[in-house]
Amino acid sequence: MGSPGLRPTLLLPQVLLLLLALLHVPPSQGFPGSGDSPLEDDGVWSSHSLYKDTPWCSPIKVKYGDVYCRAPPGGYYKTALGTRCDIRCRKGYELHGSSQLVCQSNRRWSDKVICKQKRCPTLTMPANGGFKCVDGAYFNSRCEYYCSPGYTLKGERTVTCMDNKAWSGRPASCVDMEPPRIKCPSVKERIAEPNKLTVRVSWETPEGRDTADGILTDVILRGLPPGSNFPEGDHKIEYTVYDRAENKGTCKFRVKVRVRRCGKLNAPENGYMKCSSDGDNYGATCEFSCIGGYELQGSPARVCQSNLAWSGTEPSCAAMNVNVGVRTAAALLDQFYEKRRLLIVSTPTARNLLYRLQLGMLQQAQCGLDLRHITVVELVGVFPTLIGRIRAKIMPPALALQLRLLLRIPLYSFSMVLVDKHGMDKERYVSLVTPMALFNLIDTFPLRKEEMILQAEMGQSCNT
């Protein structure tokens, strides 16, 4: 046993250490914390191995993270000097700072850490649209795209910020897929005016409207434009408009034009019919005439009336009945006025060679004579044995003589006189004339040209 005076001196350090351990008073200046600032490394194991079984640093708490600590060998507390702690952030959060902390001799952890919520890149605002997010661009935030009126969303409507700091799906866009709107007028029905086959129809040009940006690039019309004269029938009008996205809108309507009509008329047998306008529409007029050798009976003209009935009576063409019992040559000629042309053949005797040859040529050209409305009148002999003949009818000698005197036809020689439908002396012949030469002359007459047109329409010719 030693000196009693030395025992207090030997026990004093042990007592102080025990007291410090019980009161948690650090041996050096400093303050506890969870890593407010890094100080020194953990190379104090040997010099501070004395404190490895003593709580030293403050417990680590990481919001939105988990802490996994390992005490030094032989240690008991996970906040003892030299303890190493691994920091892991929860899903959707990322670590800022060191992933491993060490409890240092200054009672501080080697670094300060924090788990921050992960953030995705800011979404691009779609043109002509936008988006709304639940929690901005942070993890698990859901954003929903929307488009302005007239635009359609293309792509995924909803995206979510994922753990890899990327958005689910591709960014959406707003495209103009809605066609422009255009409204056409209603069906228009019109009735043609008298003697007309068309109706002037007008309407306001329809205006298109684009539901997106309101801009239209083209307006195309198919059909007659407004203000046109529409013929009889059913006409389809179509307007098409395009917007800048090349979407098209279409509207259609119809224009109906009706022509009021009477029943169709036919030309009388052995006659002609010439009608105005379309021949049977309200207001149309049809005129009738007969071929040479026939006389018109009934109405010379008929009109399609508002009650859709024809005026007058139905015409007909009757064979011309020449009256040779009239007293004067003028009265005889009046029967042919505007109806027939006359070719008067005069000879002092039936034995005249020119007369016989000429009559033979005319008989062979009877079709051409009929086509040109020519009646042959024969004056044969010298008064009082003079006779006149119109085909099968014989005129009295006195009437035949008057005709010679009226037209100044020589009494004692062969001659011919061509008289037109107006009683005019057109040509005289003192020798033979071929039917072709005669026909060529007559075909130059103005009235004959109109006849030729009608005959062509009716298909009348000497070739048929």
UniProtKB/Swiss-Prot annotation:
Signal sequence extent: 1-28
Coiled-coil residue windows: none
Record-linked CDD domains: CCP
Domain Sushi: 57-117, 118-176, 260-319
InterPro entries registered for this protein in UniProt: DUF4174, HYR_dom, SRPX-like, Sushi/SCR/CCP_sf, Sushi_SCR_CCP_dom
Disulfide bonds: C57-C85, C69-C103, C89-C115, C120-C161, C147-C174, C262-C304, C290-C317
Highest taxon above the source species: Eukaryota
Annotated keywords: Disulfide bond, Glycoprotein, Proteoglycan, Repeat, Signal, Sushi
Residues listed as glycosylation sites in the UniProt record: S34
One GO cellular component term noted in the UniProt record for this chain: endoplasmic reticulum
Domain HYR: 177-259
Tissue distribution of the protein: Normal cells and cells transformed by human papillomavirus type 16 E6E7 and polyomavirus large T. Suppressed in cells transformed by oncogenes such as V-SRC, V-ABL, V-FPS, V-MOS, V-SIS, V-K-RAS, and polyomavirus middle T.
Protein name: Sushi repeat-containing protein SRPX
